[in-house]
């Protein structure tokens, strides 16, 4: 959520931001609500001043044994008016906050202006595409041929956009989770947490999924419970409504969770394979940091996510998301896109973002500098480290051999009993 004072003083700037983000949202209702709000506050202040002054007059009249009944009756009417205005103000402030929650974050000045993913510039690349002397297959064909992925039975159990992992498929998924967590905790210094996989609406509001993206979520019927769309939600909200000490920052957390998404609006996209599922596993990285270090921490976060792909020997590129493609809560985002030879394309495998104080303001996460009483909002960051299913996809497609087997990256073999290939 943006700061109210900033919104009030920068209407033109925010209008431009909304256009750059390709968002059809007028600030006129917010400006009108703010006008009403300030009018009521002024009137309440004047009435209270009048009431306080009248109280002194009433005291003087009583002391002088003069009639004060008319003034007392007038003040009763003033009190009734103040009560009515307070009720109006409560309603207006609720509408005001609801509208503020619909305004996305301001992009950082370094974010390129663009319409969609076609305008995302490539920031860097690592490695090279594998040289295959045969026609590469997509991962769903590889997995089904090896008997490690079963989409037909998954559809029988749950429906479309689910997968059943068999044998080495299940073992490979589990190995990747352990591998990622080990690197992030032992090499990168993150603290591992295992959060609830169900969250309430307050947590989703804090990280920005609600109210705008309600249709993307799975809600439990008749309960204020939602399945987590990403570990970002429960992990960021660990410190909701808390004030941390400066010495406690930065906070670095990593967590594995399954993620659940309705994929509303994705009809017809990626209907085969593991790329777009209702349920998938992900290892998440979350940071709570001081404002002045957040962009340095974003670059470190990106490197931490890249490290996983480098250890696995998978070719990838990093793109900077333009204004028209970036997420609602983000001030700046890098996407890591891994090369998939079976589909002859790059696909997102991690998204690393700095939200500045946007989420912290919504979730009320603050910190206090040493020797000061005043508190400030922390800056929050997160990134996938990585999406586990898509990493498995990349291993199958990049490691496929002409005989139909799949070579396991050496770094992952200790997690699989030193097996070198799946056949």
Swiss-Prot record:
Keywords: Aminoacyl-tRNA synthetase, ATP-binding, Cytoplasm, Ligase, Nucleotide-binding, Protein biosynthesis. It is an enzyme of class 6 (ligase). The keyword Aminoacyl-tRNA synthetase applies. GO terms for molecular function: ATP binding; serine-tRNA ligase activity. It catalyses: tRNA(Ser) + L-serine + ATP = L-seryl-tRNA(Ser) + AMP + diphosphate + H(+); tRNA(Sec) + L-serine + ATP = L-seryl-tRNA(Sec) + AMP + diphosphate + H(+). GO terms for cellular component: cytoplasm. Its EC number is 6.1.1.11. Belongs to the class-II aminoacyl-tRNA synthetase family. Type-1 seryl-tRNA synthetase subfamily. Catalyzes the attachment of serine to tRNA(Ser). Is also able to aminoacylate tRNA(Sec) with serine, to form the misacylated tRNA L-seryl-tRNA(Sec), which will be further converted into selenocysteinyl-tRNA(Sec). Consists of two distinct domains, a catalytic core and a N-terminal extension that is involved in tRNA binding. This is Serine--tRNA ligase.
């Amino acid at each position: 959520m943006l700061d109210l004072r900033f919104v009030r003083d920068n209407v033109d700037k925010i209008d431009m931001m909304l256009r750059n983000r390709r968002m059809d949202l007028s600030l006129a209702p917010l400006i009108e609500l703010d006008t009403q709000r300030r009018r009521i506050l002024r009137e309440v202040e004047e009435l209270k001043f009048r009431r306080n002054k009248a109280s002194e007059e009433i005291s003087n009249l009583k002391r002088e044994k003069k009639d004060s009944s008319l003034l007392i009756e007038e003040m009763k009417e003033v009190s009734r008016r103040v009560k009515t205005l307070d009720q109006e103000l409560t309603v207006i402030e609720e509408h005001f906050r609801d509208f503020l929650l619909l305004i996305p974050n301001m992009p950082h000045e370094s974010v390129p202006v663009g319409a969609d993913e076609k305008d995302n510039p490539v920031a860097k690349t690592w490695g090279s595409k594998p040289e295959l002397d045969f026609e590469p297959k997509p991962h769903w064909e590889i997995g089904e041929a090896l008997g490690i992925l079963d989409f037909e039975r998954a559809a029988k159990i749950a429906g479309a956009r689910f997968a059943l992992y068999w044998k080495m498929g299940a073992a490979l998924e589990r190995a990747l989770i352990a591998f990622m967590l080990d690197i992030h905790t032992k090499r990168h210094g993150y603290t591992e947490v295992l959060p609830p996989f169900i969250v309430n609406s307050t947590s989703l509001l804090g990280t920005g999924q609600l109210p705008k993206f309600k249709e993307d979520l799975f809600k439990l019927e008749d309960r204020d419970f939602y399945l987590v769309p990403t570990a970002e939600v429960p992990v960021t909200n660990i410190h909701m409504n808390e004030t941390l000490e400066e010495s406690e920052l930065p906070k670095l957390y990593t967590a594995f969770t399954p993620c659940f998404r309705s994929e509303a609006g994705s009809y017809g996209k990626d209907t085969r394979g593991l790329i777009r599922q209702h349920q998938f596993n992900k290892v998440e990285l979350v940071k709570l940091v001081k404002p002045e270090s957040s962009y340095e921490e974003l670059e470190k976060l990106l490197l931490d996510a890249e490290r996983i792909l480098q250890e696995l020997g998978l070719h990838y590129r990093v793109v900077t998301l333009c204004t028209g493609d970036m997420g609602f809560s983000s001030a700046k985002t890098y996407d890591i896109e891994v090369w998939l030879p079976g589909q002859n394309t790059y696909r997102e495998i991690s998204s690393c973002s700095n939200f500045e104080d946007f989420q912290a303001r919504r979730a009320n996460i603050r910190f206090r500098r040493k020797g000061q009483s005043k508190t400030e909002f922390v800056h929050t960051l997160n990134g996938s480290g990585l999406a586990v299913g898509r990493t498995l996809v990349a291993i199958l497609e990049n490691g496929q051999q002409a005989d139909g087997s799949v070579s396991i990256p050496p770094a992952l073999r200790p997690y699989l009993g030193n097996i070198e290939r799946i056949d």
